[in-house]
């Protein structure tokens, strides 16, 4: 029996929500370990659509414990709003089935405002953030001035922590010619939020250690994707946290040995939201066709995603940096009906062939994809639930991806419905 970490092997939006929900049936605990409410996902259960951003997908299943780990940045307003919406849909969410790390960093209104101001002021060099305060909150965490959830329980020290935070932020705001924040207003707001948030607070590392020793199965749910990792992604067009699988240990307080099997998710093609390099992007009719058929619009932002062919080089790189044991390949059905499909197998950089994506921003912009053409298929793969339901050419496509990225496919998803999943290897039993 292994614990399982689910991470994106591309730029996010790979369908992690559905796969995590599908796997959570076998898990006792579902843990979010990084990111914030900037990475939304949509789940369809019994014909009903649920949209999550901050909460673990496990909240949609009865008798499961969901945990938000210390590696997450936590927006109180977004949290309470999401809980309210889920309750309105009949989902039970309470401290009985949801725990939040007491040492989680809080996202405050000043973080959201700073994030938005930076993006607007630097339009020519904007990263393409969701303007939800994720980056500024992580900056304060690293700068050792963040307000954390447990601080709301100590009103004697909270004012001093707010003063320390504002010493930094008000200096920035003076430089940006923005009005300063008043610490008393922030204290009043946090004091009002405390009774609603503190019942969820937990010493998460201790809780998870106890559950691990009891033999409980844990599912660690990553947000975004490996190519958005602050160290291993397409820097600076990345998120502000580590998104690779190793962060599951750091972001939950467990040791690396507790991680277990790593399942990497990738689409049968490639998408990206916002700015940054995208070697296989198809800014043409093919890209538009993929986007329309795949309904490629951001869950949170509604922004259209950029679309392109499958990039085996980038996914292979994610397999290595995340230690991925098996892939969950999603949205194969979107490629139904194409006469031929292109797959990127390498790059040319300044006239030389290379087998990896370079780290430098300039080099990333100059790489040219090397494509292999694969015959398409006309028969539908949508809603397939076994290999026997798949066209022979679709199976060949999957097998070729396995060869190119050096990793087997463990799961194959053929629609947003959780039942439309072909199981090759159960990650919990690997």
Curated annotation (Swiss-Prot):
GO MF term set: adenylosuccinate synthase activity; GTP binding; magnesium ion binding
GO biological process: one example: 'de novo' AMP biosynthetic process
CDD domains: AdSS (cd03108)
Binding site for GTP: 12-18, 40-42, 305, 331-333, 413-415
The protein's annotated pathway: Purine metabolism; AMP biosynthesis via de novo pathway; AMP from IMP: step 1/2
Family membership noted in the UniProt record: Belongs to the adenylosuccinate synthetase family.
Cofactor binding remark: Binds 1 Mg(2+) ion per subunit.
Catalytic activity: IMP + L-aspartate + GTP = N(6)-(1,2-dicarboxyethyl)-AMP + GDP + phosphate + 2 H(+)
Entries under Gene3D superfamilies matching the protein: Adenylosuccinate Synthetase, subunit A, domain 1 (3.40.440.10), Adenylosuccinate Synthetase, subunit A, domain 2 (1.10.300.10), Adenylosuccinate Synthetase, subunit A, domain 3 (3.90.170.10)
Subcellular location: Cytoplasm
Designated gene of the protein: purA
Protein name as catalogued: Adenylosuccinate synthetase
Binding site for substrate: 299-305
One GO term describing the cellular component: cytoplasm
Annotated positions binding Mg(2+): 13, 40
Enzyme class: ligase
Alphabetized InterPro entries for the sequence: Adenylosuccin_syn_GTP-bd, Adenylosuccin_syn_Lys_AS, Adenylosuccinate_synth_dom1, Adenylosuccinate_synth_dom2, Adenylosuccinate_synth_dom3, Adenylosuccinate_synthetase, P-loop_NTPase
Coiled coil: none
Catalytic residues in the record: 13, 41
Cofactors, names only: Mg(2+)
Job of this protein: Plays an important role in the de novo pathway of purine nucleotide biosynthesis. Catalyzes the first committed step in the biosynthesis of AMP from IMP.
Residues annotated as transmembrane: none
Highest rank taxon of the organism: Bacteria
